[in-house]
C-alpha cells in the first residue's frame, strides 16, 4: 500500500494539483461536443419531450429519465450503454445532461467579444489597430486592405464602400485585395508570425525614445510573449464553432399553469441558431452581398449577446424589457457563480432561531430547543434507535421520531452528549462570529446563549437570530472542540486582550459590590474568616460596603501560604474568593472599586498566570456574582438622577459676554470672519466642558441621608463610571448642556444647544439638533456597506498569507518607538513590542547585561525588564522584513494573539489581519449616532505645558527677539524635548512657526509650566530683520482685493487668485524689506528679504511702513475646524490601504537642501531645492493657491513637507523607503481606530502592507528577458536575477512598488482567486491568453475547487500528502 493512500484516497474529482486555463481551439470544442444543435426548438409543447436536434435534444445530451430512451423502447438498468436505433438516445443516467455539451457550426466566423471589448482589447493590440477600427471591420462598416498589390494603398488601411469603389475604378478590380467582416480579421491574425514580430518589437523598443510609444510596444510585446508561451493561436479568438452548454445547466421548467420558465441562455442560443440557419440558407441561395453581410452582422451580435450581453451596443431584452442574463453575467458579481455558489454554499444540518439569554449556562454550553435538536440530529437518532433494537427499520425509526415517542428523547439526549454544535451570528465579521458549544436540550423555541460570549458575536437579545450547524465527521467534531469551543476563544485575535469580559449588568453588579462607604455600620471591625463575616452581615452588624479589616491567607512570591491583614469590604472579599490562588494574582487587583477596565485586567492576569481552565471558571463565577448583585442593588435610572448644575447659568452668561466681545472685535475689523467663527466655537466648547465638569462633580459626590436603604451614589453616575452603560458624553447631554451641533457637512453650528434633555429643548434647538442626528442615521446606513466592502477587499488581498515555516533566518527588522502626540506618550513602545521577537540581542544600557537574545519572543516578563532598563527604541522582527518565499515565518510574526504563544505553522494570519482591521470598521460606523450628532471637538491647542519636571532641549532652534523682547520661533521643524536626569526623552512637542518661546535650551522646568504659546487660528508670516515694507506685484483687483466685511464694513487687504486675468498669471505678490537707502535687505542665509504671500493671506501692514524684527506682516487664516469622527476615519483607512493619492496631497522634499522660489509657470509656483552636495537641483511645480510651509532660504531635510497635507504614499516609499512608509501607514491607520478607542495590533496592519508591497517594477532589464516597465512578483524577480547571475548575465534592476489592495488582489498569482474577487471577465480573458496555471496555494481557490483549505489542519494534511508522494516516488 502506498503512503498516499494511507492519508485517504483522493476521490476522482480531486486528482489534480493545478488548474490551467486556455483559449479553446475549434477542434477542442468539437471534441467536447456530442452532436450539433441545428434547430432552435427546445421541447414539444404537447408531449413535453425534447425536440430532435434542438437545444434539449436527448440524442445529443442524453436521456431525460434514468436508463430510459426517448421513445421508450429500452427501459431499466439492464439496457445501459445501448444506443436506441429508433430515437438514437443512449440508455444511461440522466445526470449526463449536466455534463454533455453540444456545438453549433457557424456559417461565418464570429469574434469572441471578450477578446475584442475587454480592455485592453487583445485583438486590436495584436493587429496594432485601434479598437474602433477593428469594430468597423467586424460589424461590416468598413473594408480593410489586406494586400495593396499594385495600388498605393497601405496594408491595414480602412475603406468605406464608396472609397473601395473609387479605388477599384482607379486601379482595377484585381490590383489589390480588400475584405470585410470577421473572416478578414481571422486571416490577419493567422498571418501573424509571432517569432518575427517579437524580434521586430524588441528592436523597435531599443530605438524609440518616446515614453508613450515604449509603453505601447511593451504592451504588445507582453501579449505576443503570452501567446508564444501558452501556445494559443491568435485566430482562435475568432470562432468558427460555438459550444453549447449542457441543458440541465440552462433548464426549462414547467410552472403550475402549464406555462414554462426558461433560462435566458436558451433564448440567447435560439437567436444564434435562428440567425445561423438563416445565414446558411442565404449563402446557399446566393443572396445579394448586402443581405448576407447584414445577416453576418446580426449573427455576430447574437453571439456577443450570448457571451456578454450589453457589453457592446444595446443589450438584448426580453418581453418585459429586462436584459437577458448572458454567460458572463452568470459568473459576475455577488449573484454570479463564483460568489453565490462556489464561495458561499447553503449547507444541510443547520437551523436558525431567535436567541435569548441563558445566565445559568456554563461558558461552553448553549441551550438548544428540543424540536430543533430532533430535526438536526435525525439521522443519528435513526441509527441509534435501530442499533438498540427499539426500531426494526429506518422507516419505523422515522415514524417513531415523527410521533415523538418518549424513547426518542432519551436517544436524543445520548446522541447530543458531547457532540458540539456551531453557533453563528450574521454578520460574521471575525472568526469569533462562529463558535462551538455543547448543546443542552431546553423547552421552548429559542436558542439560549451564554451572556459572556455576546461581545464576540456582537449579539444582543432584542430579536437577534443565530444559526446552528452540526459538525458531522469525527474530524469536524474534533476541530470544533479543539479550535472553536467558546472556552478556547478567550482572547481576541485582534489585540490579544480577553474578549470574554463581563459587560453591562454584570459590571454594574460588581461595581456596586466593591463600593466602600464611610460611616457604615460596623466600620473597622476585624474578621478572620468569611463564615464569621457572613454571620455578621445577616445579623446586620455590617453591610457589604462597610470598611473592615480581614486576615487573608495568600501565596507569597516563593509560593508559601502567609497571613496578611488587609483593609477591605465584605463585597470585595466575595470577589477575592473567586480568584485562583497564584502568587502573581494579588488581592490588591480587586481591592478597589471594580470598573470594566479593572475586571478585564484581572481576567487577563488570570489567563496569563493560571491558564485557560481557571479563567473560564473565574469568568463564569464572576458573571453569576455580578448578576446577583445587579439585581439586589436595586439600581435604577430615574429622572432625579440627572442633575443640572447650579453654576450652569453663570457659565452660559460668561460665555455669552465673551462672544459679544468677539463680535465687537470682528465689527472693528481686528479679526476675520473665520477667526471669529473659530473663537466662538472654542468658547462654547469650553463652556460645555465646564458645565459638564460641574455636573460630574455634583453627581460623583455621595449623597448623605438618614433614610434606611438610601442609595448613596447616583445611579446614572455608577452606570457610566463602571463602564456598564452610557458614557459621560451622554450624561453631559442629559444633565449639562447638549452643546454644539454639527451641520450635515460636518461644519459646526455656532449657536449651541443650551438646554439638556431633562429641561427639554426649544423648537429652535430641536430643529438644529435634528440636523446632526440625521447625519448619524444616514452615516450608519451608508458606512456599514462600505465597511463590509473594505473587509472583503482586505480578506481578498491577504487570504494566501499563511505561516509556512518556523524561521526564515533574516537579520532584518524594524525599529519601534513610542507614539507621542502633543508631548503625551499615547502608546508606549512596550505596548507595541509585546508578543514580537527581537531582531538583535538586546542589552541593558547601564549594566550591559543581556536581556533578550535575537529571535526571542518578548513576553510580559521580558517586557518588564525592558521597561525597567528604560529602553524606548527596540529593533523587532516584522512580517515586512520576513524573507520566506511563500507565506511568512513564525519568528517574524511573533505571538498568536488568540492564544498568547508563538504562532504555529499553518495559521491563516492574513485572514485574521483582514478581519481584525475590518471588524471594528463596521462597529465604528455605528458609533456616530449614539451621541446624536453633538459636536465632539476639543478646544484648539494654543500652548504647551510641561507634563514633567525636566530639562529642556530644543532641536533646530532658530529664534528672533521681537520688539516686545519675546523669543519668536522662526524654524519650521522646531521641536522641544523634555529630558529626565539620565537624558532619556520623556516628552516631545512640535513648536509651530511663529510661536512665542517661553523657555530656552538647557532650562529646567517644573510640571505644568508653560513652555510656548501661539495663535491657533492663523499661520503668521514673520520678518527676521527690521526695515521698510515694499509691496510688489500687488495689483488692486487682480492679485489683491480690499475685502469689506458685510457685517462690519471694515476693509482688509486679502491676496486673491489671479488666474482669470492674462496679466495676473505673471504676478507673484510679495513683500520686500528695504533698508534706509532703499535697497533690499539681505538675510542671514544670503538671500534677499522677500516674503511671498499665498492666496487668502490677510495683510497686517501697509505699504511703506517701518517694521521691526519678529513682526507679523501677514496672517493666513486656518480653515474652520470640523468634527472628527470615523466618518472621516473609514474612508481614510480605505484611502491608505488602497494607496490612493489624497485629495490635497502634500509635496515632500526628495533631498536635503536649501529652498528657492523659481519663476512661476502659468497657475503653478516653482519650488527649487538645491542639494548640499551641489548636484542637480530638483524642481517642484505646485498650484498657486496651496499653502507652502517653507520660506525661501529655509533648509529642508529629505522627507520634509513643502506643502501642507497628507503625503502621497508612493512618494514616501520612493524617498524614504519601506520602513518609513510602513511606520506612516501603521501610525495613520492606528490614529483612526484610536480615536474610537479600538485597539488593533500593529502586526495586522503590517501583514496588509506586506501584501501591498509584493510587486516590483523593472527599471532596467539587464541581460534578462524582462521588459522595462513590467511589473512582476518580488520573489519571481529575485529568482530570475539569480539565474541571470548564474549564467553570467547582467541582472535586471527594479524598484519596489506600492499597490492598493484592490489592484494587489487582482494581480495575485491565482487567477481563480482574482476572478472571484472583481472584474471577472477581464481576469479570465487575461489568464486564458497567457495560459495561466493556478497552483491552488491560497484559501479561496481551494474553497472554489472544493478542497480543504491549506491552512490550519488542512495545511498539515497537505504537508503530509506531499511528503507521502515524495516517499512513494523514492520507493518506486
From Swiss-Prot:
Instruction: Tell me the GO molecular function terms.
Output: DNA binding; DNA-directed RNA polymerase activity; magnesium ion binding; zinc ion binding
Report the cofactors. Mg(2+); Zn(2+)
Tell me the domain of life: Bacteria
Binding site residues for Zn(2+) 2: 808, 882, 889, 892
- The UniProt record lists the keyword Metal-binding: yes
According to UniProt, the reaction catalysed is: RNA(n) + a ribonucleoside 5'-triphosphate = RNA(n+1) + diphosphate
| GO CC annotation terms, alphabetical | DNA-directed RNA polymerase complex
Pfam families given for it? RNA_pol_Rpb1_1, RNA_pol_Rpb1_2, RNA_pol_Rpb1_3, RNA_pol_Rpb1_4, RNA_pol_Rpb1_5
Q: Which UniProt keywords apply?
A: DNA-directed RNA polymerase, Magnesium, Metal-binding, Nucleotidyltransferase, Transcription, Transferase, Zinc
Family statement drawn from the similarity comment of this UniProt entry: Belongs to the RNA polymerase beta' chain family.
Q: How does it assemble?
A: The RNAP catalytic core consists of 2 alpha, 1 beta, 1 beta' and 1 omega subunit. When a sigma factor is associated with the core the holoenzyme is formed, which can initiate transcription.
Question: What biological function has been recorded for the protein in this entry?
Answer: DNA-dependent RNA polymerase catalyzes the transcription of DNA into RNA using the four ribonucleoside triphosphates as substrates.
In Swiss-Prot or TrEMBL terms, this protein is called: DNA-directed RNA polymerase subunit beta'
* Gene source species: Rickettsia akari (strain Hartford)
